[in-house]
UniProtKB/Swiss-Prot annotation:
GO terms for biological process: diaminopimelate biosynthetic process; lysine biosynthetic process via diaminopimelate. GO terms for molecular function: N-acetyldiaminopimelate deacetylase activity. SUPFAM superfamilies: Bacterial exopeptidase dimerisation domain, Zn-dependent exopeptidases. Its EC number is 3.5.1.47. It comes from Lactobacillus helveticus (strain DPC 4571). Catalyzes the conversion of N-acetyl-diaminopimelate to diaminopimelate and acetate. Transmembrane segments: none annotated. This is N-acetyldiaminopimelate deacetylase.
């Protein structure tokens, strides 16, 4: 198979868009990707499907004079969203959609892979088609399962995320944090239920929960550096069964978002302190569950990111945009905590929609523009 053309990449993207699958269920997507990859020039390609993560694909391109292995990651899963675009290539899987643009991500990766399979790079290139970015922390699972060992271990790692706010094909990046880290919060208050007329014989968890919720609102404003940024949102509270019975149990669910891992751990500790205080003050049991999984802040490596930005800024064919941090989460942050690297935005020119929207409709011109910009950077990075 020759280098994939723009029209071929668009057709691939449209087929991928038709077959979205949820985290760790990406069998049809995996098989379609593998069929395309096996059609590339295999002279210096090694393809690996890890048993530990069977919908993942690793492709290693052997360099002509390798000094390092450069990794490139793309995610492959979709979201439980009912598509409303009315496109002729809309999702054929009810209730599931590529509403975060991972079909664009995969198409760009295939474009890069097809080019370097025909034009042997100087350094080794490792392509990682990752399942389960939207949930289940596929990047963390891959690392902990040891699939990046031996010749499949990257010395540096790169990855993109589409951005509908940026023009099609524009590249956005910044030094420091690109995406926030996220942690799921579950708090269970366990007291004693009773008749509404006799509160002295009960232990009201609703009152305690109200106090705890108000105290949690002070964590960001009074415990976090105001120059930094963090968010705690408590989006769900469940308690009681009827108006005249004091609730013996209350559950609070929410999310933490922070721009550095240090900040997230600081917020975690403050929540622990507050929950312990409420437990003592109201004489009840308070269980706090914090689940970050692999959704660490995406903290770009300073040296590699300076190099990436410099190339993109000085390439007249690239529309480069210096971006601000986003409070959305991305599990590539876990991998960037293990390997130095850079994540960046690829504009897809759909400003009237947003990520995770049922109406997301990326401009397909972004695919070939993304391929060309990243291909140029990788060639430059290898010193060819």
């Amino acid at each position: 198979m020759a280098v994939l053309t723009e029209s071929e990449l668009i057709q691939i993207r449209r087929h991928l868009h038709e077959i979205p699958e949820l985290a760790l269920q990406e069998k049809e997507t995996h098989d379609y990707l593998l069929k395309i990859i096996k059609g590339f020039n295999s002279e210096f390609l090694t393809i690996k499907v890890p048993e530990e993560l069977p919908t993942a694909i690793l492709v290693l391109i052997k360099g002509s004079n390798p000094q390092r292995t450069i990794g490139y990651r793309t995610d492959i899963d979709a979201l439980p969203v009912e598509e409303k675009t009315n496109l002729p290539f809309s999702s054929t899987h009810p209730g599931i959609m590529h509403a975060c643009g991972h079909d664009i991500h995969m198409s760009v990766a295939l474009g890069l892979l097809s080019y370097f399979s025909e034009n042997q790079p100087k350094d080794n290139l490792l392509f990682f088609f990752q399942p389960a970015e939207e949930s289940e922390s596929g990047g963390k699972k891959a690392y902990e399962d040891g699939i990046f060992e031996g010749k499949f271990r990257p010395d540096e790692f790169y990855g993109l995320h589409d951005n509908p706010e940026l023009p099609a094909g524009a590249i956005g990046c910044r030094e420091g944090t690109l995406f926030a880290g996220t942690t799921e919060v579950n708090i269970d208050l366990i007291g004693k239920g009773g008749h509404a007329a006799f509160p002295q014989n009960a232990n009201d968890t609703v009152v305690a929960a109200a106090s705890l919720i108000m105290q949690i609102q002070t964590v960001i404003s009074r415990s976090i550096d105001p120059i930094q940024s963090g968010v705690i949102t408590l989006g769900k509270v469940r308690a009681g069964t009827i108006r005249n019975v004091i609730a013996g149990q209350t559950r609070i669910e929410g999310t933490i978002r922070g721009l550095t891992q240090k900040m997230i751990l600081q917020i975690d500790q403050r929540l622990q302190d507050l929950c312990e205080g409420i437990a003592r003050s109201y004489n009840m049991k308070v269980n706090l569950e914090l689940n970050q999984g692999g959704y660490w802040p995406v903290e770009n490596n300073p040296e590699l990111t300076k190099n990436f930005i410099s190339y993109m800024k000085n390439n007249p064919e690239v529309d480069f945009v210096e971006t601000k941090p986003k409070m959305t989460g991305e599990d590539f942050g876990f991998l960037l905590a293990k390997f130095p690297g850079t994540m960046f935005w690829l504009g897809v020119g759909d400003p009237d929609s947003q990520l995770h929207s049922a109406n997301l409709n990326p401009d397909e011109k972004s695919i070939i523009r993304g391929v060309n910009a990243i291909k140029g950077f990788l060639i430059n990075r290898m010193g060819i």
